[in-house]
Amino acid sequence: MFDKILPYLLSGISVGGQYALIAVGYTMVYGILRLINFAHGDIFTAAGFFMVYIAATLPVQVAIPLVVVLTVILGFTVERAAYKPLRSAPRMSVMISAIGVSYLLQNLMWYVTGGLAKQYPTIPWISNSITIGPATTKVVTIVTPILTILLVIALVTIIQKTKIGMAMRAVSKDFETAPLMGIKIDSVISTTFIIGSLLAAVGSVLYFTNYTSVTPTVGAMPGLKAFVAAVFGGIGSIPGAVIGAFIIGICENLIKALGYTTFSDAFTFALLIVILLFKPTGLFGEKISEKV
């Protein structure tokens, strides 16, 4: 029985790490702006296409840092063009803008690619096979959770120990009062989007190493699952988002191991409904009171 489950368990831990890198972007933006960045999954997809086109002309080792830089620029541009002008607008307007950006990015990718799936390049070493007990998997399966944990530890350290991290925490606690304390709101928000986009780019490289085909809408499902992970863990809580992502990744793969592959996606969204019904703040989220 263990021999059968082990490959799915390893895959679940790996997928959970990939969801976690996306989920942190959702939860950081929500923590600062109280906004669900619906375009985040499309930025993740764009990172996949960046790699496809850049790796066609440059070595993969050069392409990866370029992909990260381009993805960060895209995330920064989205924030400046679509969200910054609406800083004082009603929250519904910002949410509609986020949905519009998502569809804009999807349609741009459809236009550029003609709607055709693109083959993701093979990345040396992490695409190699490795045997762990009775299971054979890719090196990326082992690298993903380790890299995810290291990146999250680095991020938490930045938030807790640095000046920009203190500013992020201040803005998250009280958006209106923070500017009166000399905090540059625009810089904090831009930094938040930059970090979220960077993590999405890393998650994209890890994700598409296993799922080698990139389409304009491929980021929708991992993006939604990462969002559910953020809600499950307590949106606004980075550790909560990471734990929620690993739980979802492991559970959906164990469901596949039991032979219920069709219901693996349904489990994630059933979990979302249960969380919203019984614990809307998630595992580690705090109840937020609106100021009148």
Which role fits each region the language model picked out?
Residues 1-21, 50, 61-62, 89-96, ...:
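Membrane-interfacial amphipathic/re-entrant helices at transmembrane-helix boundaries
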Residues 10, 32-77, 81, 86, ...:
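Membrane-embedded helix boundary and interhelical linker motif in transport proteins
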Residues 15-16, 136-214, 238-243:
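Helix-loop-helix "hairpin" substructures at the membrane interface of multi-pass membrane proteins
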Residues 17, 26-49, 88-93, 164-167, ...:
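Short, non-helical or kinked segments that cap or interrupt transmembrane helices
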Residues 19-21, 58-69, 190-200, 206-270:
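Transmembrane alpha-helical segments in multi-pass inner-membrane proteins
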Residues 51-53, 68-74, 101-109, 147-156, ...:
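Hydrophobic core segments of alpha-helical transmembrane domains in multi-pass membrane transport
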Residues 58-101, 108, 243-248, 279:
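Alpha-helical transmembrane segments within multi-pass membrane transporters and channels
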Residues 85-161, 188, 212, 254, ...:
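Transmembrane helix-bundle core of multi-pass membrane transporters
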